């Protein structure tokens, strides 16, 4: 069962994404910001199959988190989420380390498809 770390500062979004992903049998762990997510990753030795993170968060944003994860856990797939066009542009410069950027608002089907695609790419 794939383990997925979800980082988002909005409780309702973390809950929605975790429930959607759990529908496919994935184990989810959540963090309120990038710093907490990085701490979890480090403590667990990167033992996750996918990081799904919002870009705009306090303490450590998703871009900084993605850069740290790419450095420390280069095999971990990363999906970014954003509701802002300018952040999507910022993320486009990270194509080498980010699998995809999911635009908010999204449907449950959209996020499940994005996660399935990222996990399939990890196995390829």
Language model features with spans:
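C-terminal output helix
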Residues: 106-119, 123
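Charged docking surfaces used in two-component/phosphorelay signaling
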Residues: 15-23
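Short hydrophobic/Thr-rich beta-strand motif most characteristic of the beta2 strand and flanking loop
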Residues: 25-32, 39-40
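Conserved sequence signature across two-component system core domains
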Residues: 7-8, 31, 51
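Receiver (REC) domain active-site loop signature in two-component systems and cognate sites
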Residues: 57
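Active-site beta3 strand of CheY-like receiver
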Residues: 46-52
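Acidic catalytic/metal-coordinating carboxylates
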Residues: 33-36, 61-65
